[in-house]
């Protein structure tokens, strides 16, 4: 029997989801652990200073590759989210009091880890008057202050689409402003009931109008069709999105949205080709790609597509922008060969 989340009753949608057993993964969803000197050095720094990253705590399968490039992701705003998305394992409950010292600690962690590029993400804070806008902006400011050679990507909620709150975040000038659309209009309300499809597009539009490099993500396998994915890509590009990541939904546990289908690497390649034809500046597409995966590489590619050079203080990111990556669909296809349709079945079957 599935237990209710700590601190609240199980929702009806969670009880319904729990009736579907956890699915067995296809053969192409696997990672080969390869460690290098940069990863080992990062690991020592993190354990020695008791630092915390999403990479470790979420058990990200890409930690070895990203850490080898000295990239890491931090979660801010506490452990509880004021909203609930049906794919996300972050606990939905009353958020903790705002920790105004968190920006300093995150910036010091970035310095201790000697990161080339950092991604900041976090929970929604609808309980706060500014919905957490100050926090997201201040973390960027503090990282830039203490780490002038570290790129910062700010992956934020929508701040209810309020221009004044978004403006505060924009003015901190992260290298990349990211807001994830995640899915298509037909199933959006079912998957992200507290968000709105058009509002998320408008957040991207406002960031691009401000002059920032923009980024978003689509998760496949939650019930969308191929045509709907293409339409969402068109919508994102029309809104001014520079960078797009496309990934397979992996169910965090029984209470979450059941997997509708396993998307083959060949389809991920098709979507990537379509996105490039539309004019996205940087594209990363594959089953185990995540929105912060190789983020520094994508930032460098997006600037190049704009005809811009990396800032002098971030010129070292050019060394991470060459060649393919382990989780891109074309790399998987080269490694495992042509894929076969894989039905969604219980791991207990």
Swiss-Prot record:
Binds 2 [4Fe-4S] clusters per subunit. One cluster is coordinated with 3 cysteines and an exchangeable S-adenosyl-L-methionine. It is an enzyme of class 2 (transferase). Residues 67-281 form the Radical SAM core domain. [4Fe-4S] cluster 1 binds at residues 55, 60, 66, 292. GO terms for molecular function: 4 iron, 4 sulfur cluster binding; lipoate synthase activity; metal ion binding. InterPro entries: Aldolase_TIM, Elp3/MiaA/NifB-like_rSAM, LIAS_N, Lipoyl_synth, rSAM. The keyword Zinc does not apply. Its EC number is 2.8.1.8. It catalyses: [[Fe-S] cluster scaffold protein carrying a second [4Fe-4S](2+) cluster] + N(6)-octanoyl-L-lysyl-[protein] + 2 oxidized [2Fe-2S]-[ferredoxin] + 2 S-adenosyl-L-methionine + 4 H(+) = [[Fe-S] cluster scaffold protein] + N(6)-[(R)-dihydrolipoyl]-L-lysyl-[protein] + 4 Fe(3+) + 2 hydrogen sulfide + 2 5'-deoxyadenosine + 2 L-methionine + 2 reduced [2Fe-2S]-[ferredoxin]. HAMAP family: Lipoyl_synth (MF_00206). Belongs to the radical SAM superfamily. Lipoyl synthase family. NCBIfam families: PRK05481.1, PRK12928.1. This is Lipoyl synthase. It comes from Corynebacterium diphtheriae (strain ATCC 700971 / NCTC 13129 / Biotype gravis).
